[in-house]
């Protein structure tokens, strides 16, 4: 029954929405044609963008933070395959200003609520040449960065847009240090980060992180990569960088019919590394709102897996005497998960196609037929009784065309069995992404090209029809599309824990402190932490302390977190497993207390479903003591800090890497704590509210 009070409240809400809509219309102020510069400031006047045209008719933009230049005048435009370039002879025919302010709630994430506040400048460009082609550039200016994109309107002289290259420049205004991973190399995104002067960048993937000599931190990335080629960054000279689109084997780098927008080109700008991380909701804000509606079927969770044993070469994906995905072992893993409150089991190697050279022969995979020693229905039924959901696995060997031919049948089967999450895989060398050409041929393409962008979105949209979430490995980069498609829960996209099994080299101690301020600015990463054995293949040492493995559950964000080690290894460390059981994967709030790229970081997160906070702190190969304030705790409330810290003798280089102290301490919001981190170490803390 709806009461009169509820009706009045609803009418009030509707009236408020109408007033806000009217305000937005009135705020959109069209201006007449102008040849001089046009400037727009962020809401608090921290960041400004100026757009103009030079004497040759190049459209340029520049960015300042306060009075300090961040990006010097940089050119905009396109090189086309079958028409003259859109680069020179441009004039600004009209500009349009508007502003926007809203808060929206994530169904899952690092923050429950996100503020989306910006000022927008639309710049309408037209050629002076006889073709009179038009191009719009839209700038959204936030207090912590800028996003801009191109929009190709419908027009008679540019109906089909075939892009040979995007000519966007980023002229960084002062010398800077760059953290970057190379593009177009064989292992796709899975490279350790280079740290070089900006002038020594080769061709880099995004996100790319910069620290200028004056202390500004900048991340270059993109948002809303839809039906377009992924952007890479190349050095031109000095601090001048340019966009380089990923190539295509089936035509131009991008081919689309107008009208359409490009992805957003994004610069996050901050005065510290922690502030740079806190700016990453900007990527989400540049994406469209949720298109799926009710997504209560998407479940953040911790899960175990038939996975690490394969990477250790104790088990195999292929059938035979070492086959890992058997009914008996799956039941054993389900029992382990249920006993510890973990609600998922990933099973790799369950389906036919792994025998032989699966790396090269992705067309051999079936996504509906199991090996004889694995009964998919029986295992899912057993897990359901124990409260443990099976997580499907679809390794494609990057044969996207073959996968698409089975995708509906595979997701329909999963849905019928109650499987609500699937991990996809695209293992291949760079340039080995197999797609269908217009003439029906299978051709080799790039993991970040336009065909890949189309494929990944098709997977996510198809999965959504069957209420299935997607965790993509060897994926296309994260550009915030999880806002639009909340079933795209996580992905790999950098060196994860598996490199500590067989990598040469293994992940060094600074790797995670690099990831936090580089890769993680794009979005969640399925890093697969929690290897308490600290051993890789052949009994080799992992370059970490045990306490750091716990801290990774907090500092490397993903709404799905793997409890990646073998059950027999967890049995040796019951005190440490308690933290893994307790730590959530879904958060109401996140704060970065300290950090420097590649050196250290401390992050605290508030559980979405309780008043508890969780802290993770990690360091590189150097021991550190970091003093942190507990002012994030609720004032006047009392908490018990459950502390998991490196022992005084802990060191990733010695047999004392397991040395861990577990202790408890009463704390409140006015307290500080000194976090003593061993070389290659970390610390994890649960702040539990006293009832």
Place the predicted regions along the sequence by residue.
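Glycan-recognition and catalytic regions of carbohydrate-active enzymes
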Residues: 123, 565-614, 651-657
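N-terminal accessory beta-strand-rich subdomains and adjacent acidic, glycine-rich linkers
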Residues: 34-292
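Aromatic- and carboxylate-enriched substrate-binding clefts and catalytic-loop regions
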Residues: 349-534, 545
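C-terminal beta-strand-rich structural cap/linker in extracellular carbohydrate-active enzymes
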Residues: 663-691
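N-terminal secretory signal peptides that target proteins for export/translocation
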Residues: 1-15
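Bacterial N-terminal signal peptides
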Residues: 18-29
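An acidic-aromatic substrate-binding cleft motif
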Residues: 257-340, 344
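Carbohydrate-binding surface patches
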Residues: 597-639, 683-684
């Amino acid at each position: 029954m709806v009461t009169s009070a509820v009706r009045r409240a609803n009418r009030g809400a509707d009236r408020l929405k109408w007033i806000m809509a009217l305000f937005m219309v009135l705020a959109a102020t069209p201006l007449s044609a102008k040849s001089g510069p046009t400037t727009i400031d962020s809401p608090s006047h921290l960041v400004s963008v100026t757009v103009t045209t030079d004497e040759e008719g190049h459209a340029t933009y520049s960015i300042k933070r306060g009075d300090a230049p961040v990006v010097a005048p940089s050119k905009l435009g396109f090189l086309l395959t079958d028409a003259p370039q859109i680069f020179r002879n441009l004039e600004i025919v009209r500009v349009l200003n508007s502003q926007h302010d809203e808060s929206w709630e994530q169904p899952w994430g690092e923050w429950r609520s996100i503020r989306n506040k910006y000022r927008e400048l639309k710049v309408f460009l037209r050629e002076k040449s006889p073709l009179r082609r038009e191009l719009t550039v839209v700038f959204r200016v936030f207090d912590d960065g800028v996003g801009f994109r191109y929009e190709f309107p419908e027009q008679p002289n540019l109906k089909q847009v075939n892009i040979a290259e995007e000519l966007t420049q980023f002229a960084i205004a002062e010398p800077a240090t760059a953290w970057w991973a190379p593009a177009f190399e064989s292992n796709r995104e899975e490279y350790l980060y280079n740290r070089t002067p900006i002038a020594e960048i080769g061709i880099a993937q995004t996100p790319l992180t910069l620290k200028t000599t004056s202390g500004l931190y900048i991340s270059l990335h993109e948002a809303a990569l839809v039906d377009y080629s992924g952007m890479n960054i190349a050095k031109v000279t000095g601090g001048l960088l340019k966009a380089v689109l990923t190539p295509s084997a089936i035509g131009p780098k991008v081919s689309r019919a107008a009208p359409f927008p490009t992805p957003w080109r994004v610069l996050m700008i901050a005065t510290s590394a922690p502030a740079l991380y806190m700016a990453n909701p900007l990527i989400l804000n540049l994406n469209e709102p949720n298109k799926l509606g009710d997504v209560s079927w998407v479940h953040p969770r911790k899960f175990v897996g038939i996975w690490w044993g394969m990477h250790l070469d104790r088990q195999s994906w292929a059938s035979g005497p070492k086959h890992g995905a058997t009914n008996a072992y799956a039941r054993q893993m389900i029992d382990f998960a249920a006993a510890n409150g973990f609600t998922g089991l990933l099973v790799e190697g369950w389906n036919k196609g792994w025998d032989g050279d699966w790396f090269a022969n992705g067309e051999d995979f079936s996504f509906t037929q199991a090996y004889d020693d694995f009964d998919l229905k029986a295992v899912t039924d057993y897990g359901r009784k124990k409260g443990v959901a099976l997580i499907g696995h679809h390794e494609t060997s990057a044969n996207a065309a073959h996968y698409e031919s089975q995708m509906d049948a595979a997701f329909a089967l999963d849905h019928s069995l109650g499987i609500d999450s699937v991990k996809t895989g695209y293992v291949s060398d760079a340039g080995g992404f197999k797609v269908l050409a217009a003439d029906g041929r299978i051709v080799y393409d790039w993991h970040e090209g336009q065909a890949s962008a189309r494929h990944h979105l098709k997977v996510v949209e198809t999965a959504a029809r069957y209420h299935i979430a997607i965790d993509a490995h060897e994926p296309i980069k994260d550009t915030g599309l999880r806002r639009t498609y909340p079933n795209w829960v996580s992905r790999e996209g950098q060196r994860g824990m598996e490199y500590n099994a067989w990598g040469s080299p293994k992940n060094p101690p600074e790797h995670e402190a690099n990831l936090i301020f580089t890769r993680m600015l794009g979005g969640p990463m399925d890093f697969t932490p929690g290897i308490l054995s600290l051993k890789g293949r052949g009994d080799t040492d992992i370059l970490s302390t045990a306490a750091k493995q716990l801290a990774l559950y907090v500092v490397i964000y993903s709404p799905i977190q793997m409890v990646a080690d073998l059950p027999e290894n967890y049995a040796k460390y019951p005190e440490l497993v308690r933290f893994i059981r307790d730590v959530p994967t879904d958060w109401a709030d996140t704060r970065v207390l300290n950090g420097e790229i590649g050196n250290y970081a401390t992050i605290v997160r508030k559980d979405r479903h309780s008043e508890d906070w969780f802290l993770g702190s990690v360091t590189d190969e150097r021991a550190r003591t970091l003093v942190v304030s507990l002012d994030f705790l609720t004032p006047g409330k009392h908490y018990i800090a459950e502390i998991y810290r490196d022992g005084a003798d802990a060191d990733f280089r010695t047999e004392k890497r397991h040395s861990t102290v577990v202790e408890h301490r009463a704390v409140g919001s006015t307290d500080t704590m000194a976090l003593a981190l061993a070389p290659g170490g970390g610390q994890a803390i649960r702040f539990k509210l006293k009832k």
